[in-house]
């Protein structure tokens, strides 16, 4: 077992130092943010504690009629207000910033002129998109609001190919064709499409070399770690995405490629309606010799055709159906006498969600520490805490390992969180993640296995496609020494909560857009901030142009080989 670390011990001093450097407050002035709702719109009032102890709200200027684009002066005030709200609300991850070598507020500030000088709705909307993306957070995005900026108008389209990243050299990543819609390619009269083949290397995208493409489209791609960035860049090469400004695309996708013999050629691929594209993958079969015995919304269950004592879970999601899906898995496993079998969980195709600890309680035979979380105390967090404190408990049945009624969250908001706000702490004290599996009084965060559970050895196959709750799922296995891990790290973008707010031009009733903030840290069972700090697998096997045709079967075989060896 790994060393027992009290959760929160690694909320390093550098976090508070980073926050204090970003929040330039006068020593004797305590600043709060409060949301003031009036006549159906929202304003931000900044309350300062002066020596006399009285609070004064900043009064809005006289409301004027505007268009959603505003004026240069109002756009600059809007920009300043976003920077200030971000400075006081955002839960920064030193791990993420150090790993990617950037400062989010500096990158946001560099976009000032783009916002101020916007002349059209598209200019402003996509400028604000870049402003949001500058924080490099997979969770955060813009949402159009009534009477505000219209937002994306160009529908999504995709070219009839699939692209994957080659991770063999993280300093010079490359991309290659991993799948084709041969029917659409054969029907196309565009030049070069007849030469496109699975495995061909991408040399340029719409005239941009790969380094230029990465540098240009990084700003348009929400990500929290380099592996996730390259995954999403590859995924989106064939896609004309509405969240990216339309002027970033051509009428068709122009690629320069290199074939298996090293010969270069150009191809122009048409953009098509996404639901008409059907991709044939280069990795035609993920798990040869295994057959699906159960299909559920959140995972598929496979067993080997040769009768080996192995259960393979192809994990897909963590949605509400997970409760029943896991019940079905355990009932089937108990009936088939599988609970002592070797368990391999492939999460490379999974997204996020919740209730992962509930599933783990039925997959392991030892107590384990769950993830923890906190909130950075600000106006946004205070409103969330106040709302939870008065929210009624849900009338739902109790389930072992789950608190679906949210009563533990409500109790925390009424007691511990309220005390932390009153004590003017920078962050609330760490509690079991979202109080979904344990109450705030559980300081060690230890969860017990369910009465019926798996008892065999476990391996996790990871990859950068997904993150968020998936990051937590893998970290609970890895940090508690419950499983062998192989493959690549997950996306690394788990947090506790996001705050959303409709932005208005300051002093007016003119809405602009809904903006988001990451307002709390997820803490791994080892006490470290999770965002930008996903589990590094024990055996790192990068996806490459050379191994993609057999990648999953190779990892599965390696995992089974490792689990079959005695542990020294």
Model-derived features: where do they sit?
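Non-catalytic, well-ordered alpha-helical segments in soluble enzyme domains
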Residues: 472-483
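Flexible, low-complexity junctional segments that flank or bridge functional domains
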Residues: 57-402, 457-459, 472, 489, ...
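N-terminal secretory signal peptides that target proteins for export/translocation
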Residues: 1-35
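Bacterial N-terminal signal peptides
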Residues: 41-49
């Amino acid at each position: 077992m790994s060393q027992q670390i009290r959760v929160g011990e690694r909320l390093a001093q550098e976090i508070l130092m980073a926050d204090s450097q970003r929040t330039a407050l006068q020593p004797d002035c305590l600043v709060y943010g409060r949301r003031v709702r009036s006549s159906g719109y929202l304003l931000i009032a900044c309350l300062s504690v002066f020596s006399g102890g009285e609070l004064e709200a900043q009064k809005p200027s006289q409301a004027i009629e505007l268009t959603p684009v505003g004026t240069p002066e109002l756009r600059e005030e809007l920009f300043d207000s976003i920077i200030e709200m971000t400075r006081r609300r955002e839960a920064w991850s030193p791990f993420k910033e150090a790993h990617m070598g950037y400062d989010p507020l500096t990158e946001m500030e560099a976009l000032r002129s783009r916002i101020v000088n916007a002349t059209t709705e598209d200019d402003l909307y996509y400028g604000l998109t870049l402003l949001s993306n500058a924080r490099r957070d997979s969770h955060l995005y813009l949402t159009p609001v009534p009477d505000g900026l219209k937002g994306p108008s160009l529908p999504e389209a995709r070219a009839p190919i699939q692209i994957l990243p080659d991770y063999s050299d993280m300093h010079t990543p490359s991309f290659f064709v991993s799948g084709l819609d041969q029917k659409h390619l054969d029907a196309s009269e565009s030049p070069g499409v007849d030469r496109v083949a699975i495995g061909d290397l991408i040399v340029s995208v719409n005239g941009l070399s790969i380094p230029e493409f990465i540098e240009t489209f990084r700003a348009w791609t929400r990500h929290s770690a380099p592996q996730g960035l390259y995954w999403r860049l590859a995924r989106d090469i064939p896609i004309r995405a509405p969240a990216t400004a339309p002027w970033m695309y051509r009428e068709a996708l122009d690629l320069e490629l290199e074939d298996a013999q090293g010969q270069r050629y150009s191809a122009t691929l048409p953009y098509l309606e996404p639901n008409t594209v059907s991709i044939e993958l280069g990795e035609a079969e993920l798990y040869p010799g295994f057959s699906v015995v159960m299909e559920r919304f959140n995972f598929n269950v496979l067993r080997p055709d040769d009768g080996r004592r192995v259960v393979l879970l192809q994990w897909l999601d963590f949605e509400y159906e997970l409760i029943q899906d896991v019940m079905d898995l355990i009932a089937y496993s108990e009936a088939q006498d599988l609970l002592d079998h070797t368990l391999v969980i492939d999460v490379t195709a999974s997204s996020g969600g919740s209730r992962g600890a509930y599933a783990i309680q039925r997959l392991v035979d030892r107590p384990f520490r769950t993830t923890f979380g906190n909130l950075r105390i600000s106006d946004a967090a205070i409103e969330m805490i106040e709302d939870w404190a008065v929210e009624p408990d849900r009338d739902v049945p109790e389930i072992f390992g789950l608190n679906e009624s949210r009563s533990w969250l409500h109790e925390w908001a009424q007691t511990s969180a309220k005390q932390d706000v009153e004590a003017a702490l920078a962050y609330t004290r760490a509690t079991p993640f979202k109080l979904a599996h344990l109450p705030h009084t559980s300081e060690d965060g230890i969860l017990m296995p369910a009465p019926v559970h798996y008892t065999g050895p476990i391996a996790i196959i990871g990859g950068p496609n997904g993150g968020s709750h998936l990051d937590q799922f893998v970290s609970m296995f890895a940090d508690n020494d419950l499983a062998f891990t192989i493959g690549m790290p997950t996306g690394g973008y788990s947090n506790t909560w996001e705050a959303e707010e409709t932005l208005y031009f300051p002093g007016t009733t003119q809405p602009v857009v809904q903006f988001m903030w990451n307002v709390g840290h997820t803490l791994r069972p080892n006490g470290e901030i999770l965002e930008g700090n996903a589990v590094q697998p024990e055996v790192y096997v990068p996806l490459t142009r050379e191994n993609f045709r057999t990648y999953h079967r190779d990892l599965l075989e390696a995992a089974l080989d490792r689990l079959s060896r005695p542990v020294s």
